[in-house]
A protein has these predicted regions:
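Non-catalytic, solvent-exposed segments at the cell envelope interface
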Residues: 1-195
Length: 195
């Protein structure tokens, strides 16, 4: 993706050292019987490439409420710039900053803000979104308007997207007067296309 915006990136940047870090992921889910009990999944999208364990802001904050009895799913997105009481500091700050203290802090912050249990969570970053969409063979999204972003052009109507196109589609906000609201809708469009 860097290469798309900086064609000389490979020639101008030299890798001098790399390190692999393994991190055990703590499971703090509140498990329920998903076949007959409604449950909530929190999806945190962090604004980085590479390892999913990278410390970063939580820019996508999506609540997926699943009711297996009615076979319905409700998507609710909370804007990253909402001021909420952060679980780790007990003071108000932007929701996006909760991610800096890790996914458990963000889940606890969201649960307190919404006044409900979060049964499961998933953390996604730029790399994992591209990988998932490509693993599906791409996705078909019903694009709601013509625009260009990240070197890609999106046309009104059904459009097939690979991982990089889906990422650029779900990140763009500067092309729209109501940018953050449109970006949230596009993020939901991408998730629904993946299901």
């Amino acid at each position: 993706m860097f290469e798309d915006n900086h064609p000389d990136f490979q020639n101008e940047v030299k890798e001098i050292w790399t390190s692999d870090i393994e991190t055990k992921v703590k499971d703090f889910s509140t498990r329920v019987s998903v076949t007959n009990t409604p449950f909530i999944i929190y999806i945190s999208g962090i604004d980085t490439y590479g390892s999913i364990t990278t410390v970063s802001r939580s820019d996508v904050n999506m609540i997926v409420t699943v009711n297996p009895n009615t076979k319905k799913i409700l998507l609710t997105s909370i804007p990253r710039d909402y001021y909420v009481t952060l679980a780790n500091m007990q003071k108000k700050d932007k929701l996006t900053h909760s991610g800096i203290a890790g996914p458990e802090n963000t889940v606890k912050t969201m649960a307190k803000f919404l006044g409900t249990d979060i049964n499961y969570y998933a953390r996604v970053n730029f790399t994992s979104l591209v990988t998932m969409v490509d693993a599906l063979g791409g996705i078909t999204v019903n694009v709601d308007r013509d625009f260009s972003a990240g070197g890609y052009t999106y046309k009104l109507g059904l459009q097939q997207m690979n991982g990089k196109e889906a990422l650029a589609y779900s990140r763009e906000r500067h092309s729209f007067a109501d940018g953050d609201n449109v970006r949230v809708k596009h993020q939901q469009d991408v998730l629904m296309a993946m299901l």
